[in-house]
Structure formats: structure tokens, C-alpha cells
């Protein structure tokens, strides 16, 4: 009886198990990808619900907010810009 038990495991060589292992790996990867996609959709839905609106509307709002932020940066940089003539005057005074 013990000989037949060992015989079963001798027949299951790694070469014969490769397709089975590969199919289990593919199944695991596909279910993981599906779960990640569902989680991303759920997260996106929660964000949309909290923000109130669809993705397209939120993209438009985000883009306009980004453009407004860029304008504010440009205005601030102009306020703090140094004129080369001012630098030359300071050097002359030294």
C-alpha cells in the first residue's frame, strides 16, 4: 500500500505539473486584476460622490483650478522679479 502511495507522487513530476501551476497562476493574476479594477472603480465612485459630479466635470474643474494656480504663480513671480538694472545700481553703490 505504501508503494502505491509513493507511486502516485512519483508520477506527478514538475514537468507534468507546470500547466496546472501556470493555470492557477493565471487565475490568481486575473482575479487580482479584477479586484484591483473593482476597487479603483469603487474609490472613484466614492470620490465622485463626495465631490458631487462626474469625472468629466471634475476634470474641467481641476484644469481650471490648475490654470488659476499657474496665473497666481506668474503674478507672484512678477512681484518678486529682480530687474537687472537694479542689480547694476546696487553694484555701483558698493
From Swiss-Prot:
This is Uncharacterized protein C17C9.15c. It comes from the Eukaryota. It comes from Schizosaccharomyces pombe (strain 972 / ATCC 24843). GO terms for cellular component: cytosol; nucleus.
Amino acid at each position: 500500500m505504501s508503494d502505491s502511495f509513493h507511486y502516485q507522487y512519483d508520477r506527478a513530476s514538475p514537468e507534468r505539473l507546470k500547466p496546472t501551476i501556470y493555470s492557477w497562476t493565471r487565475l490568481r493574476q486575473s482575479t487580482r486584476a479584477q479586484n484591483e479594477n473593482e476597487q479603483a472603480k469603487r474609490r472613484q465612485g466614492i470620490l465622485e460622490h463626495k465631490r458631487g459630479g462626474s469625472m468629466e466635470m471634475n476634470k474641467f474643474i481641476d484644469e481650471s483650478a490648475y490654470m488659476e494656480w499657474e496665473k497666481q504663480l506668474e503674478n507672484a513671480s512678477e512681484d518678486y522679479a529682480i530687474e537687472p538694472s537694479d542689480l547694476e545700481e546696487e553694484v555701483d553703490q558698493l
